[in-house]
Amino acid sequence: LRRFFDHYLKNIDNGWEQTPKVRLSVLNPGGKNIVNRVENEFPLARTKYTKLYLSAADSSLSTSLPQKETISSYQSESRQPKVTYRFRMTKSTEITGYMKLHLWVSAPDHDDMDLAIKVEKLSKDGKPFFDPTGATIAATGYMRASMRQLDTLRTTEAEPYYTYTTEQKLKPGEIVPLEIEIWPMGLMFDKDEILQLTVEAYRPAAAAIPFGSARISIPKEGYTYQPGNNVDLVTLGGNENQCADPNEVVTSPATHNAGKHCIYTGGRYDSYLYLPVIPEK
């Protein structure tokens, strides 16, 4: 970013206008990442979108719609409120761009449901990859069923947009399709590595965190500096008595999950993951 600031804040003629409009990285957990690749646009014009259909019969994903209708389910208030589906890559594959999950669901015991979606890469023997913080490397999406109404003027096949103006509660026994947006990501798979899709009940994170309990060091003079330079630091926080006004504490949001969640696949229920596959050049 230094060249950007030099050009626009200091009027330095450094050729910034010739900088490519799109540069992206494609993560390859367990392999070598592709970094700073130049592209002409995003999403990429050469994208070949592919549907992977869910099958509750064997917890799999496949390129063809299963003929048999089957159901996956879990108890949303259990310790492991989730189901997973897997697809083993038949060749080296790049997935870069916007993803979407088209999912048929019902909530027999309630009138709403909050879902969390995760798309991640597993090794050939089904083990997850972790980043330096210990978290899995994944693309995620979240959806409240009652907020499923789409903005038809803005929605595309790959990118659903919601109106957020109409609450559509679920009726007893009602099976509805959800279009769930998944954050864009660049991910490389080698042959025989596994794409795993997880659908689970979303649990809101606690929002009432004690203010001031974390200790953090920041530059004393409040400026940025080059890595490796020695600067004076000041430590803030570390005292739980330094709390915010109790009236300003944000309470944790209430969950809209209760009882069983059902996911329908096959036959009339064409639940699928919509993937942006990038052909090799």
Residue ranges and their predicted role:
Residues 1-9:
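Catalytic-core region of carbohydrate-active enzymes that cleave or remodel glycosidic bonds
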